[in-house]
């Protein structure tokens, strides 16, 4: 009975995600009727129908909104997945992808390149610079946290927060002293957004989310044991340090990839795992797929709100998720 309910929940969430993805393509500064969206998708994916729509509508839907929608679904899924496993290994309900220092490292890399190097390899310049910054930040956190051979969760989080503050201070100083026109460009990226979405940029985030999900699902039992406490994990024969290190590396690499293309989008990895646990409990083989689906649906619709609320301008997604996340946790605290 429980397995049947879980299967029905996955089917319902999967259906909701598919419907959300299609319906969201009609929203934006230029409205495209849903029947036109549907015909464009059928024609592009399966060759059905005769293109009797406006070429401008096809350009908007297929080249702008579909990549953006797919990137939003991937980023939402990835951040929710990372948040769930970090909350498990740290046993901290407030842990999220941005506590590891990776986001601030990506920000610093982006700031340095935009202000002092320029777009030497075109559209890929900013994502590559951000990813390199994220990797360097991850290595610094790891070196400091494991200096004395220990890698407990408190030390990991504290090192991540400390490195994050230092890197953000350097990034803000460079922005303050740099060219203001370039600063405004990188500021929008720092606030989070899906404006960089292009078909050619989707392969790497897709691979990172899929491989991350497979690897972390394979670690579901160790994650369950760590949630019960380090002593329980040791009793079951697990090496808590090794499990924690593997999760940290997977989470950091995924965060680096996602942040490099979407900027800093907060609260998804913090809020979605809490909602998922209320639906299916804390067993990670059941929890992680639900987190992925919920995170995707959530960010697809937040992006719709971001591009329609102050149209024709784009509201940074990080602003929208921060507002929703803050209200969510205020409501949660009031209920308790």
What annotation goes with each model-predicted range?
Residues 1-336:
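Alpha-helical transmembrane segments in inner-membrane proteins
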